[in-house]
From Swiss-Prot:
Protein name per its UniProtKB record: DEP domain-containing protein 7
Gene from which the chain derives: depdc7
UniProt family annotation: Belongs to the DEPDC7 family.
SMART domains referenced in this protein's UniProt entry, alphabetically: DEP (SM00049)
InterPro entries: DEP_dom, WH-like_DNA-bd_sf, WH_DNA-bd_sf
Gene Ontology BP, a term: intracellular signal transduction
Amino acid sequence: MATVREKAVALDLCATYSPSQRPPGPNGSHRPFRATYIWSSIIQVLYTQVEVKKRRHHLKYHHDCFIGSEAVDVVFAHLVQHKYFGDMDIPRSKVVRVCQALMDCKVFEPIVTACMFGREKKRTVFEDSSCSLYRFLNSSNLLGVQVEKSNGRCTPQRPKHSSFQSASLQSPSLEDLWDNLSLTPADPTHINLTSNLPPKVVAEVWQEQTIRRLLQLVDLPLLDSLLEYTPVAPRIPNVKEEDHNLTSNYLDREILKAFSDAQADEWVSAAVDCLDFLPDHMVVDVSRNLPEQQAPDSKWKLLLFDTIGKHYSQNRAPLLRNQLFDIHTGIAELLVNGKTEPALEATQLCLKLLDSPSREEFRRLLYFMALAADPSEFRLNEETDNRMTVKRMFCRAIVNNKSLSKGKCDLLVLFILDHHKDVFKIPGSLHKMVSDKLVAIQQGTDPDRDTGYTFCQRVDKREFDSAAQNNTRTELCALLKTIYENNSLSPKEKKRLLGQFYKSHPETFIQYFGDRVSSVYT
């Protein structure tokens, strides 16, 4: 059987359907066979949607990298949103296998290396993790990864000259790949090919569906906090301020990074990454108080831990904002009742509502906390173990609300710490809900026709009015009974309250007391 690349060459598809080209229009003109088209669209969406930027991991800086879990999220959303496989539920594990196939076919490569017997060896298994980094093999063709000065993020631009040569699909054909994944492409007439919705609309749908899914998982007494939730806009730095920082504080931060590079310790690397979110004066203090190279590890590790802990122990807004306090309480209740799976999904949704800088800050802090809490690492406190020391130091930085008991705060923080590799993933249920809503908007149908889970029954107006009157009458009778049978009220006070009730609701009063009306109220 001919390989996919041979088929593409025979059909002259390399240039036409490379990631640099837009997918074919809804009319399906010049469309390659279905699996090749799906593969091409996956590669294109990876190039254009994953966040590619300089990242630090395993004591080194790596340029033009993206995170493994984010690649899975992007591919997952793309497959579900465009309904390439109809309404079939696609588990996240199969999307991971798709990413594994992309890596095997040299679309991208892992840059994180494992040291074995003094030699560095590339990982061969794709990891759905926020700690695994990858790089496109033809990243040189990703014209100018532009850096947004407002938040330092890098976004890849669509390559102008790129083909399948860098991603030569030489293993089984794409049809065989989908067969092995137990996924069958839908009929081409049902494949959603249009994606012309404005980014603002897509972002609003993501937030709306995230809130809707949270309401399905967590029982909330009030909805105001969710309905009025607006992410905090990232701060736009002043150009003059930025120039000043480059001259006065940039050197101190670079000294710290060079110091951590000289230490073969992931603990130190994670700590220095957290310093990016600390104010300049604290970073300057750390850089100018670094111990000598001959000093024991405990001295400078304790300096880093105390500095980070001091910053997050200050009176500042918690990373899990109090605006979503009811959600945090609901997650804690799920944990108390032993419902860990819905608690994990609710936590993932809650973190999805955070703005990008806050998510990145929380991710770095959580990774550092996980390393520092390891019992095999440097002992932070002689009296308590590392896990409890880390929890006590950073608990208020994550959740800080007086209405939530200390026990539930500790439970929630330790749960997030134990699942730090999973809490930033996007649940598959949310992908499905967003996909259905976007498809409905694109097709011009009512996007709220199918609301998913239903907690009430639709009734007509006559039935609603009747139920309202009956329920009101029942509650009024219960109130009247409470007043009449309350022995703590004086006869004068009781007579006054009964008189007010009779003047406001005479029919209910007469119905309740019947022939005794004259003796009760005269």
